[in-house]
Every structure is written in C-alpha cells, then in structure tokens.
UniProtKB/Swiss-Prot annotation:
The keyword Transport does not apply. This is 2-amino-4-deoxychorismate dehydrogenase. Its cofactor is [4Fe-4S] cluster. It comes from Streptomyces globisporus. It comes from the Bacteria. Its EC number is 1.3.8.16. Pfam families: FMN_red. Converts 2-amino-4-deoxychorismate (ADIC) to 3-O-enolpyruvoylanthranilic acid (OPA). GO terms for biological process: antibiotic biosynthetic process. Belongs to the SsuE family. One of its GO terms (molecular function) is oxidoreductase activity, acting on the CH-CH group of donors. [4Fe-4S] cluster binds at C50, C53, C56, C63.
Amino acid sequence: MSAQLKILAINGSERDGNTADVLRHAARVAENRGVDFEAVDLRSIRMERCGPCGDCNDRPVACTLADGVPEVVAKMVAADGIIFAAPVHGFGTASLMQTFIERAGVGYLRFDRPLSNKVAGIISVARRYSAGEVWAQLTVNALLNRMILVGSGFPATVHALHRGDALKDEEGLTNVSRLVERMTDMIELLDEHRRLTGRSDVLASNEVNERVGLALNELQAQP
C-alpha cells in the first residue's frame, strides 16, 4: 500500500450535533482500518451564496467569489474518498450543504471533474422524514462528479431527534460502519491497482467538461 489513504467527510450541519456524532463514529471505523479521516464542518467555513451573475454557465475558469470554498475543494481533490453528510431540514438538505454543493460544483468542480474516480459515501440524518430524499440528492451529486459509489447494503441513514439520539440508532450506525468499510475496501483496491500497473487514471474519464459547447446562458447574449 502507498502513503496513508484518506477519507474526507463534509459535514453540512449548522451545529455540532447528531451529524457530527455520526461522523465521529465513521472516523473510528476508518481509523481502525488504518485510514486517515478528517471531517470538515461547513459551519466553520466562510461561504458566500451564489450570486446573480450567471457566469458559471459560460466561463472556463473558477469562481471569483473570495471565501473558504476553494480550500475545502482542495482537500477533496487530495483525498481518496469523500463522505457527504447532511441532516434533513424542512424536508430537504440542510442549507449549508445545499450551498456548498452549488458553490463547489458550478464554481470549481465542473471544469476538469477532479473528483472523477474518487470513492464517495453518503450519510443523511433525520428525525423521521426525508432521509431518503436527502441521501438520493447527495448520491446524484456524487454521480454528477463521476465519483465511484460502492454498495453497502441499506443506505447510511440515521434517525435522531435530540442531541445524542443518533448514537442510539444501532441499525443506522451499523449501516454507516458498513459504508466506511466498503469505501475503504474500494479505496485500497484502487490504490493497489495504481501501484501494480503504474496507471493513475484507473478508469477513463472521457471528456473533461460535458458542458463545453452548450449554449446555456443565452440571456447574456441579449442586448
């Protein structure tokens, strides 16, 4: 095996609550496998919302908004696996994670698809409803970025109401453990492939940017 492998977790919760507890559980599983695990709390990152410019539909360079998003994106690019974890708020994805996937996606990731072939994991935390919907949205986001999703049985959805309740959801935590184990298996497999073959591409990434040549922002062309 090469240098220590790493999983980066993106925590889309506004507080140090159940989602953070779940990621601490995930960290223990990863570290038991010898994988470095780092959690980035979006609540601690200065993050601007997308503005009205619309330039992201046409420009070939990164977003010009100056905030903490590029630093997080750089950590994602350097990692071997990435977990997107978010609580359910208002029957949907918590606003911090929603803002992040918009800003990171259209501002930085769409041009060269630097997350291609990285291993992805999805965790959603909910009181009762919409855990599956949030899990599905984040899954589609990972697929959009050409990441590799590994099957681990039931989705890693954890149910909790009050602080600390997530740690009482034994089935949910079991699914989180299985997710991290399967991510680690795939990361190690890909690492071994690179080491034995000397290839860094692993899987063909095809065209760099599927949006090139699409006229998506016709309003800017109008006088």
